[in-house]
Swiss-Prot record:
Residues 62-101, 465-486 are annotated as: Disordered. A motif (DWD box 2) lies at residues 317-332. This is Protein pleiotropic regulatory locus 1. Its main location: nucleus. Pathway: Protein modification; protein ubiquitination. Disruption phenotype: Hypersensitivity to glucose and sucrose. Enhanced sensitivity of plants to stress and to growth hormones including cytokinin, ethylene, abscisic acid, and auxin. Accumulation of sugars and starch in leaves, and root elongation. Cell elongation defects. Enhanced susceptibility to virulent and avirulent pathogens. GO terms for cellular component: Cul4-RING E3 ubiquitin ligase complex; cytosol; nucleus. WD repeats lie at residues 174-204, 216-246, 258-288, 300-330, 342-371, 384-413, 433-463. It comes from Arabidopsis thaliana. Keywords: Immunity, Innate immunity, Nucleus, Plant defense, Repeat, Ubl conjugation pathway, WD repeat. Pfam families: WD40. The DWD box is required for interaction with DDB1A. It is found in: Nucleus.
Amino acid sequence: MPAPTTEIEPIEAQSLKKLSLKSLKRSLELFSPVHGQFPPPDPEAKQIRLSHKMKVAFGGVEPVVSQPPRQPDRINEQPGPSNALSLAAPEGSKSTQKGATESAIVVGPTLLRPILPKGLNYTGSSGKSTTIIPANVSSYQRNLSTAALMERIPSRWPRPEWHAPWKNYRVIQGHLGWVRSVAFDPSNEWFCTGSADRTIKIWDVATGVLKLTLTGHIEQVRGLAVSNRHTYMFSAGDDKQVKCWDLEQNKVIRSYHGHLSGVYCLALHPTLDVLLTGGRDSVCRVWDIRTKMQIFALSGHDNTVCSVFTRPTDPQVVTGSHDTTIKFWDLRYGKTMSTLTHHKKSVRAMTLHPKENAFASASADNTKKFSLPKGEFCHNMLSQQKTIINAMAVNEDGVMVTGGDNGSIWFWDWKSGHSFQQSETIVQPGSLESEAGIYAACYDNTGSRLVTCEADKTIKMWKEDENATPETHPINFKPPKEIRRF
């Protein structure tokens, strides 16, 4: 028996043009301009939205009745206590015999009333002319109603201490290239400088006379540090080398190998035999001084590590980089503790205050102060040194100095962030005007002398002006109008 056949419905043949027109019509229905228009405004929804906004803004304040208060009957009613301050009147005057109600100034809560939009009137059940601010309202509503009573920022900003201006009293010449680094001896008898001429020179602090020249690097020397626990000096340069010098023999006794590119900064731990170096390979390396072994490779930056310091009290390392960040590292585990992203430009210089638990960092956008050990942001310096800042230092008296790439040297009051002196270095004869940059700065152990290393191949020494007084050099200080929290 043959299987039943099913009839297939004929499909109407459609031309390609008809199909394309059908698709075009469907697209117009979906994407026509009518669908992109907003619906007509709904008055009821608009009224609900306005009432909600008014409730949020003024819900914590009881409205004041716009009706005038009822005048009391002064003939039959005895005068009672009122919310008024009576003016003093001459003795025997008629006003004193009537309860002093006519010569009174009503002190109402008009200062605390919210400013209502034009055309909006509030009515309430209470007839008293007082403003009630509940304790459970939000801080925004409380600040809205008491903004006129808030204390102004300039009155709370610390006033800077007076500091004598600094002057250049000595220029030392001897290097054949840019002077890139400086470090002082713990005994405060000499200091050493590293230069682009690949030499390290040791100078007498009192006279500025050259005492010794050390050679060993094959590129410019960018970092120097003198140990206060050993007779060692450490140097780092663009030749990827970190060297330990014995100052009794005046020769290299150890070399630390591991950096993949130039080494830009160097620091010693104050209490441990640990050396910290940062370089162009974006890594801060921690070395054991005695065994020459690398303890940690603190990797996490995305660009050159150009500044580093550590503290004696906490196992903490702080690094600044060209990637605009400042990182806190735990020296016990070699891990990142936190990252500060306040700067917008390269953090080329940092300095630790010798007494306070705080440090400052300098960038081309601003100079900022942070607290330790958590790195909480304190404030910006009140002026902006509009240049690339390569060097900064601070002494125990609270005088911070920053040196720029254009030869500008600014002196700051640490507490308030006020710049009390803005100077320019003088390029020595034979140098170009563009060689007015400052690459390194360091105070001596007393904080009374400052050494700057500059691009005109000279070393300049600064000290305070002995003849300056607060009368001859007054403080020109204007407190900021607002506090920037970034």
